[in-house]
């Protein structure tokens, strides 16, 4: 373990530059020395894509007990370790801005409770000034979820509300959140030339004054945890970002950062921008730096990872990546990327998310918003841990790691040994015979040749072969045609179940 520790700035710079090279960024990128360390005991942290913790038996995500590890003291502007990444989930604010994704107050509360099970550091739960119903929903979350402290671990989420740099916004946010144990206000204003000219109609100096006055006002109301962010930071002059963030820090902000609001940045330029801003913002060593990426060009996850590699230590994400237009960086993708490659490729950056709650959270958000993910959506799609190709199925049956870099149990999917196998026209003999054995049939080689031949015929008519189809092939023999197997009378064919037949 000692040989893995990074003990000098020069060593870390070399490591980061090696990582930049492997990720396609130029060697000359101005990544700062991050002074990363690994304070944890390697045996208690996930050191590969598949964790030992995920192997514990459970029937559903709700059966999984929280990982009982004492949380360090929460200090708004300080991290427990340089390589710890805070996760701010904004499903209940930015996610709800997805067209058609409006949530009722009870739904928001239920999702907030599930986010707490997921162990997000901060949950941004809405825009208090926007309506009376929104205000009351946020206040309810602050009073309940915001005060539910886990006595064993000390965990309680930070409850955050967003506010423009306007007094009435800040006042409404304080009134809604003051009941929480850890309230935070998320202040923002536009900083790009196009936004300042056409939206705000203000000069740079006026925008800086707005930001500074808002931070000071939030502090005067009682906020000790104050975040300031640049809207449309991805199209803002980098020196202006440094200037306004530096002034916000001086005024009392504890977390600062910027958003790629329109999703225009590419991973290389985004990482370089983050590195430049951290390196050149006065007071950056005294705060936590945050990033917020949108997915208009399909690179929100990549940009978020690039930003982390450049020194950002708070990521703003949503469940399933829902959000304005094409959405935000998905929490599940960012978290599992860090869990899978954070140790080996990114100098040990990590989160405290209980990834075993990911699937349950994803399903809940899908149900409540009506926004269902595509089957091949990374991490939470129905096909993520499913294999149909015969070559892949053969490998999976021998050892799951041949074609799976993550364990399904890591994200809360409880599977039997071979339940990731889907039978179809690409499936091979090994997978079909193995499934028949699972169903209780010991098939002779001669009989199996006949069954497999008819199985092939059946796949011409059906995209996926079910257990009922397989049972019919065994029980009824050659006289059962594929046409009959596809008929509504399939259950009639299976009137006498075969539990442990020898054919």
Swiss-Prot record:
GO molecular function, one term: methylthioalkylmalate synthase activity
Annotated EC: 2.3.3.17
Key words of the record: Chloroplast, Plastid, Transferase, Transit peptide
Cofactor binding comment, as recorded: Manganese or any other divalent metal ion.
Subcellular location: Plastid, Chloroplast
InterPro entries assigned to the protein according to its UniProt record, in alphabetical order: 2-IPM_HCS-like, AIPM/Hcit_synth_CS, Aldolase_TIM, LeuA/HCS_post-cat, PYR_CT
Transit peptide segment: 1-51
Effect of residue 46 to L: In strain: cv. Sorbo
Pfam families: HCS_D2, HMGL-like
Tissue spec: Highly expressed in roots, leaves, and siliques. Lower amounts in stems and flowers.
Entry keyword annotation includes Cell membrane: no
One Gene Ontology cellular component annotation held by this UniProt entry: chloroplast
Family listed: Belongs to the alpha-IPM synthase/homocitrate synthase family.
Job of this protein: Determines the side chain length of aliphatic glucosinolate structures. Accepts all the omega-methylthio-2-oxoalkanoic acids needed to form the known C3 to C8 glucosinolates. Also able to convert pyruvate to citramalate, 2-oxoisovalerate to isopropylmalate, 4-methyl-2-oxopentanoate and 5-methyl-2-oxohexanoate for Leu-derived glucosinolates, 3-methyl-2-oxopentanoate for Ile-derived glucosinolates and phenylpyruvate to phenylethylglucosinolate.
Protein name: Methylthioalkylmalate synthase 3, chloroplastic
Species: Arabidopsis thaliana
């Amino acid at each position: 373990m000692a040989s893995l520790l990074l003990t000098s700035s020069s060593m870390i710079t070399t490591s980061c530059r090696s990582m930049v090279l492997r990720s396609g960024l130029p060697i000359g990128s101005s990544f700062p020395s991050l002074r990363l360390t690994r304070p944890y005991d390697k045996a208690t942290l996930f050191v590969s894509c598949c964790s030992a913790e995920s192997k514990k038996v459970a029937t559903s995500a709700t059966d999984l007990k929280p990982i009982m590890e004492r949380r360090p003291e929460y200090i708004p502007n300080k991290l427990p370790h340089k390589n710890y990444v805070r996760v701010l989930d904004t499903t209940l604010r930015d996610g709800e801005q997805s067209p058609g994704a409006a949530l009722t107050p009870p739904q928001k509360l239920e999702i907030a409770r599930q986010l707490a099970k997921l162990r997000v550091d901060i949950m941004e739960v809405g825009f208090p000034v926007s309506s009376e119903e929104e205000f009351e929903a946020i206040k309810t979350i602050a009073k309940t979820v915001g005060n539910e402290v886990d006595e064993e671990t000390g965990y309680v989420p930070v409850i955050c509300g967003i506010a423009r740099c306007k007094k009435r916004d800040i006042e409404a946010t304080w009134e809604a959140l003051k009941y929480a144990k850890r309230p935070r206000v998320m202040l923002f204003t536009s900083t790009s030339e196009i936004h300042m000219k056409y939206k705000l109609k203000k000069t740079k100096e006026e925008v800086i004054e707005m930001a500074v006055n808002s931070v000071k006002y939030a502090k005067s109301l009682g906020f000790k945890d104050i975040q300031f962010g640049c809207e449309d930071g991805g199209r803002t002059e980098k020196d202006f970002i440094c200037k306004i963030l530096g002034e916000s820090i001086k005024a009392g902000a504890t977390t600062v950062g910027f958003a790629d609001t329109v999703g225009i940045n590419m991973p290389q330029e985004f990482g370089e921008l983050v590195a430049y801003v951290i390196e050149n913002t006065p007071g950056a060593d005294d705060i936590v730096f945050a990033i917020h990426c949108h997915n208009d060009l399909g690179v929100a996850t990549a940009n978020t990872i690039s930003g982390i590699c450049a020194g950002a230590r708070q990521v703003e994400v949503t469940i399933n990546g829902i959000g304005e237009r094409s959405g935000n960086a998905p929490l599940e993708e960012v978290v599992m990327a860090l869990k899978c490659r954070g140790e080996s490729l990114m100098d040990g950056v990590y989160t405290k998310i209980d990834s075993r709650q990911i699937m349950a959270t994803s399903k809940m958000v899908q149900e409540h918003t009506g926004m269902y993910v595509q089957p091949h959506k990374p991490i939470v799609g129905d096909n993520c841990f499913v294999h149909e190709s015969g070559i892949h199925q053969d490998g999976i049956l021998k050892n799951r790691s041949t074609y799976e870099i993550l364990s399904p149990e890591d994200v809360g999917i409880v599977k039997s040994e071979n339940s990731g196998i889907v039978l179809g026209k690409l499936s091979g003999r090994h997978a079909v015979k193995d499934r028949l054995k699972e169903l209780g049939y010991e098939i002779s080689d001669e009989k199996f040749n006949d069954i497999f031949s008819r199985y092939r015929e059946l796949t011409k008519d059906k995209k996926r072969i079910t257990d009922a189809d397989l049972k019919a092939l065994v029980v009824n023999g050659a006289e059962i045609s594929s046409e009959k197997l596809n008929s509504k009378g399939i259950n009639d064919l299976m009137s006498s179940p075969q539990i442990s037949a020898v054919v």
